[in-house]
Amino acid sequence: MSNTIKMVVGLGNPGKEYEQTRHNAGFWFLDELAWKWKASFKEEKKFFGEVARAALPDGDVWLLKPATFMNRSGQAVAALAQFYKIKPEEILVVHDELDIPCGRIKFKLGGGNGGHNGLKDIQAKLGTADYYRLRLGIGHPGDRNLVVGYVLNKPSTEHRRQIDDAVAKSLQAIPDILAGKWEEATRFLHSK
């Protein structure tokens, strides 16, 4: 049986100055997944980002960290998906989520973009919202005028620990997600 997910995308912004910011939670997840799968990233200009191929027993899974900055993430996702003939429903996008308490996780297929510029661009470039999302809660600053500064700053030590715990828990659900066991993955990820 082959994997139902053929590409995992972590969203973030490239560059040292953004490395530890909340908006890069998707990159944090992907770095841990690549380490777990012993896959190495290398820059691929034709895919507008860093790409790693994980050779798994049930087939290859491509890992992608767009180097386009958040609001142009779709350019990288669409380039890799088109080249390897990966359908939107075979893509998992991992990203930070303001509307979920810090350290909580939500998993879903499709839906709105919640104002997330990375998701907006992916939807525009793929022509559909029907791809899977793993949403890592980073919490909300409480005032929409503070959002940009909030996502582009480092979390507190406590919040970073909560996000790291959410990443670790999410990694445990990846085998079910790859196997298409959506209900099992959702139940596990949504539990406290």
UniProtKB/Swiss-Prot annotation:
Site (Stabilizes the basic form of H active site to accept a proton) location in chain: 96
The active site annotation covers: 23 (proton acceptor)
The Enzyme Commission number assigned here is 3.1.1.29
A biological process (GO) of this protein is:
rescue of stalled ribosome
Q: What class of enzyme is it?
A: hydrolase
Q: Where in the cell is it found?
A: Cytoplasm
Q: Which reaction does it catalyse?
A: an N-acyl-L-alpha-aminoacyl-tRNA + H2O = an N-acyl-L-amino acid + a tRNA + H(+)
Where is it mostly found? cytoplasm
Coiled coil segments of this chain:
none
Q: Which PROSITE patterns match?
A: PEPT_TRNA_HYDROL_1, PEPT_TRNA_HYDROL_2
Q: Which residues bind tRNA?
A: 18, 69, 71, 117
Q: Name one GO molecular function term.
A: peptidyl-tRNA hydrolase activity
State the InterPro entries in the record: Pept_tRNA_hydro, Pept_tRNA_hydro_CS, Pept_tRNA_hydro_sf
Annotated site residue numbers, Discriminates between blocked and unblocked aminoacyl-tRNA: 13
Q: Name one Pfam family in it.
A: Pept_tRNA_hydro
Annotated keywords: Cytoplasm, Hydrolase, RNA-binding, tRNA-binding
**Keyword Cytoplasm, does the record have it?**
yes
Q: Which domain of life is it from?
A: Bacteria
Task: List S-S links within the chain.
Answer: none
Q: Which PANTHER family match?
A: PEPTIDYL-TRNA HYDROLASE
Q: So what does this one do? A: Hydrolyzes ribosome-free peptidyl-tRNAs (with 1 or more amino acids incorporated), which drop off the ribosome during protein synthesis, or as a result of ribosome stalling. Catalyzes the release of premature peptidyl moieties from peptidyl-tRNA molecules trapped in stalled 50S ribosomal subunits, and thus maintains levels of free tRNAs and 50S ribosomes.
On assembly, the entry states: Monomer.
Report the family membership.
Belongs to the PTH family.
Q: What is this protein called?
A: Peptidyl-tRNA hydrolase
Q: Which organism is it from?
A: Neisseria meningitidis serogroup B (strain ATCC BAA-335 / MC58)
